[in-house]
């Protein structure tokens, strides 16, 4: 069973990045939206009669069209109740398009090929900020045993919603400008302060703590002009190593140099051994998988040469062995829990 695995290779050495890549402007942020809707047109893969809220929703929808139907008389399996979520970006204007995520609430088997009906998306204040509607595509992958493939009960619809209401902003009149680092780090905060004060020739930045840098706009610049110049300045930066696994697609994203320390773990019927002796020769009963990996079919053990033990190599070898996304996630979590992965592990 093959798993789609993608490796984005990057080095963790120090290099120059723009301030906008490592810090956010406080107050300039996305806002979460949520709504409840119905997906219709499913080929028998929708909610069953046990999902009472779906039947009631269908009845309510038809009643709004002057068609009265008792929820108990509805037997359609071509409809699914869903939650729809979206992010409303800062400064979004009426008519802008938003990407939406549609997720099944009931016992639907798949949303593939369905159509999301008109759904109001509300903010935390209960107001409607966007309207969603459109065709659903789950990526064309069918669900497989063990979690391989995409989740056909959830989908992202690009441009599936229109912004109807704008969030009031007073950025141009705001005199309290602050940067918030995406990853707290005293050195980065100090570097931002030093670079900005040097560029502007006056004290325009003050590092308050490991995450916060207060800004003071020069009188001859507008807020927009000032922040544009601030955010484009380069600083020296060393990114924190990270491994990201997309549970839905099985995609693994890792740096080429994210190493795994010597360890021995067992997951289900697979044993993984990172060989501290750097033995690059196949032992008896072992098959050379290349890239420093050897499989002992008699004990179902994957032995990896320590010099080649990176997250990328381990994921690639597990993929060759037919491991499912769920297996890879569990193995990576166990490696992290054992202290063998020197990077942050994020499951999305």
Swiss-Prot record:
Claim: Calcium is one of the keywords in the record: no
InterPro entries: Flag_FlgI
NCBIfam families on file: PRK05303.1 (NF003676)
Organism whose genome encodes this protein: Campylobacter jejuni subsp. doylei (strain ATCC BAA-1458 / RM4099 / 269.97)
Oligomeric form and interacting partners: The basal body constitutes a major portion of the flagellar organelle and consists of four rings (L,P,S, and M) mounted on a central rod.
Listed name of the protein: Flagellar P-ring protein
GO biological process, one term: bacterial-type flagellum-dependent cell motility
First and last residue of the signal peptide: 1-16
Main location: periplasm
GO cellular component: bacterial-type flagellum basal body, distal rod, P ring; outer membrane-bounded periplasmic space
Its biological purpose: Assembles around the rod to form the L-ring and probably protects the motor/basal body from shearing forces during rotation.
Family, similarity comment: Belongs to the FlgI family.
Subcellular location: Periplasm; Bacterial flagellum basal body
GO molecular function (one): structural molecule activity
Keywords of the record: Bacterial flagellum, Periplasm, Signal
């Amino acid at each position: 069973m093959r798993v789609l695995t993608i490796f984005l290779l990057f080095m963790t050495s120090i290099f120059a990045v723009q301030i906008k890549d490592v810090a956010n402007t406080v107050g300039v942020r996305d806002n979460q939206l949520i709504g409840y809707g119905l997906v219709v047109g499913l080929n028998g893969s929708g909610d069953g009669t046990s999902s009472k809220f779906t039947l009631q929703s269908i009845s309510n929808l038809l009643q709004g069209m002057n068609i009265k139907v008792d929820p108990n008389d509805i037997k359609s399996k071509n409809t699914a109740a869903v939650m729809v979520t979206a992010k409303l970006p800062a400064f979004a204007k009426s008519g802008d398009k938003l990407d939406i995520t549609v997720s099944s609430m009931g016992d639907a088997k798949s949303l593939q090929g369905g159509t999301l009906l008109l759904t109001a998306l509300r903010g935390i204040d209960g107001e409607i900020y966007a309207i969603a509607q459109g065709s659903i595509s789950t990526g064309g992958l069918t669900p497989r045993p063990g979690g391989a493939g995409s989740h056909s009960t959830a989908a992202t619809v690009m441009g599936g919603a229109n912004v109807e209401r704008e969030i009031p902003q007073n950025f141009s009149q705001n005199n309290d400008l602050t940067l918030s680092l995406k990853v707290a780090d005293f050195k980065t905060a100090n570097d931002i302060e030093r670079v900005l004060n040097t560029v502007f020739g006056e004290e325009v930045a003050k590092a308050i703590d490991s995450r916060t840098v207060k800004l003071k706009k020069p009188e001859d610049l507008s807020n927009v002009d000032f922040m544009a110049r601030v955010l484009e300045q380069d600083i020296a930066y060393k990114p924190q190593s990270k491994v990201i696994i997309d549970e839905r697609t099985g995609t693994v994203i890792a740096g080429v140099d994210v190493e795994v320390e010597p360890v021995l773990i067992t997951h289900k019927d697979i044993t993984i051994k990172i060989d501290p002796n750097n033995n690059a020769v196949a032992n008896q009963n072992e098959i050379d998988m290349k890239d420093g990996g050897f499989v002992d079919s008699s004990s179902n053990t994957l032995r990896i040469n320590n010099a080649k033990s990176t997250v990328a190599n381990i994921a690639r070898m597990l993929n060759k062995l037919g491991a499912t996304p769920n297996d890879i996630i569990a193995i990576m979590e166990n490696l992290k829990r054992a202290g063998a992965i020197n990077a942050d592990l994020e499951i999305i």
